[in-house]
Amino acid sequence: MQNFSEKKFEFLCKQCDEILLEKKNNIFRQGNHILHVVREHPIFISRYAPIFKYKNHKFYFFLFKRFAANIIKLFLKNFYVIISFPIRAKDKKLNKKISSIFFSHLLRDSFIKNDEDFYFKSLPDKFSKERSNSIIFYINNTSYSSKVLNKKFNLYSKKWYALPKFLSVQKEIKISFGLLKDGFKIFKDSLNLRGERKKIRELAAIESLSLNSHFSIRMFYFTKKIMDQIEPEYIFTTYEGHSWERLVYAAAKFKNKNVKNIGYQHALIFSKQHALRRSLADQFNPDFILTSGRVGKSILEKSKILSKERIINFGSPRTDVNIIEKNSFQPNKDSVLFLPEGDYKECELMIDLAFELSAHHKTMNYIVRFHPLISVGKLEERYKKSLLLNENVRFSISTLEKDLDESNYVIYRGTTTVIKAIEHGLYPIYFSLRNEMSINPLHDIDIDIIFNNLDFSKIILKNEKIKKSKLKKIQKHATGFFSPLNYREALKIKTIQ
């Protein structure tokens, strides 16, 4: 986000944490998504930009629009809950002997056919003595309803369960009133303040009514409801710093103080990543953190959110264990792979750059590979004319491996997939905007940076030996971000009191 300085970001984090800790045991305060400042990426900080960008009259007009949007969305959500209640599927009866619960994500339809979970892989089976002793609950981001997904899971005899979109009518109303009450409290506390401190509280008050905040509290009640049926010893979630993760931990502790909450830090940790590193009230903190590599383990140990023995390097499926001798730079390929993140604004930035480079370097090919959350068809339709005029630019629907094999350069911003590209011998180039905080996940490595076509031209004209040498150094450093999966390390959790 341009013109959002590090000083503003640090001030924002401090103020949001202060508001959270004023009611450190209140689930509705902890469930307010806007108070959990995840990291410095534009995807996350764009929601806070009006605090610093707008003067009073513009800011309050913005607040009014946010309030109106939240109320309309809330009304439509509750209307849907009411009319769909008679046809809602019955709750799944759970095996009381289940010892481990995993909360994961179904990001796209193709994930349904996977034999293993996208994030945890074989850990649910490895961690439990028997296959029937673990279950994976999915946050559903596919085009299928949870009811349809669960029929498919039963057909495949999988120990998977897609969480419903909503709870009962009564519970949904209870969530809304709880968040509304806390929103009024935050707004009341803002009356004696001025400037940006006041604006932060006013935005938090409005965002207490958002669907994201409702989702976090809903995850609390989902977890509580699950634990009414079974008494697991271990609960796993992905761990990025989102409010819903903390609410799952709190619900588990509410039902059983002895349950062990484990967060899996599966992605890279950014330079200014905040919510993942900061401690809240005990019941909202994980008991253990599994990291994806040595670098993540070191960063979290320094944060002191947990003792060192409770931060364990589990590894990641993102690293290729078969690549022992890293691939070297291949100058003869002349293809550039673009890796935008799962945000349409980020996709637009990368697509525009691809067309800009295409106009100046017509002999090269440009492959834009999108995140699973992005609709390729939607973007193909939008950029139909430009794609016809620039035949050397294509939006990929191939496998990642095929795209990597065809390319020798990779242009990225905040994606962690760049690590896999580096492993495969692609020369990394970070695309930055003027006057923005860096969102480079490889911020502590000497990576070439471009702002436009002129910068890119300088890189491709560099001596090939220099690029090969630099890539080797980058590859050596990058091995610390993602380690091969080590299930034995994860099992150490069972031996630590």
Region spans (language model):
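Catalytic-core helical/loop segments in enzymes performing group transfer/polymerization on anionic/lipid-linked
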Residues: 1-497
